[in-house]
Amino acid sequence: MTGPATVEPELPELHFASGLPGFPDARRFVLVRLGDEASPFSVLRSLDDGTDLEFVVTHPALFFPDYEPEIDDDVAGRLELESADDALLLVIVTVADPVAASTANLLGPIVVNRHTRAAAQAVLGNSGYATREALVPT
């Protein structure tokens, strides 16, 4: 489904204290690069028993250089973010065929504290961002 992925995780284990929306029991994940080092995509893979979850993700700045979501104080507090530099942002990608038709969920970015590896999926209300933004403009 997602293709071959390297075995070495990019980051140590990530912890989602509340799971992901729709998947409350999926709390432990690793981020694994999809393809070679030049690939802009990774797989967010669940480590929890009974959850066979994988999401293709990417760094939004690679495709959306002007993307600057405002993470609300609740999410920032739960993740103990002291500054914007503490946060790693990822967006979930829906891979299409052809790949040029793939989309990214800019409305629900994954926010990771770079220091503690605490993570959450933020939901950006009234932001103007969409759940299916084209990766490649048409």
Each model region followed by its residue ranges:
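Short active-site loop/helix that positions an aromatic residue
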Residues: 73-83
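Long, compositionally biased stretches
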Residues: 1-66, 84-138
